[in-house]
């Protein structure tokens, strides 16, 4: 990875470590560059806390990429593997980001609701199009356990997201809603990956 250390996966490792040590994972001063993840992220970090952080992040990102590649090949459209040569993927690699795993959840829908508990800002659109009873039940169980461990974490987390450095594309692109509506009306309910999103 280009970025020193474990990149974005650091939050999973630090949250899991804090919980295992009986510490409050939200006991720090947030900033625009230091906004925590929801508590369920600890589920992903827990298996790796004993490893050096860069190695843990490399394994996580490699496994996420492998799962995405497997999902693409299983779908019977290997040309989609070109995504691994794209700049968004290279950028995600540099910072050990979650986007390959979220993309993989399109092919493995049971993962999608769980990832909403970790990265709601980008996982929600995938989850809403790929809902399964098993996925919702598993995510609900994880959420329940997280609340039993730390009942007030959702409020603590929301309080600390106020420093998040965000942009709202719809305000920077006034014709965004019109363009999106035209695409939907013109091409039907098609996902960014090219699959129909109609309920069956």
Over which residues does each language-model region extend?
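Primarily membrane-embedded glycan-assembly and transfer machineries that use lipid-linked glycans
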Residues: 1-109, 130-200
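Transmembrane helices and adjacent periplasmic/lumenal helix-loop junctions
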Residues: 113-128
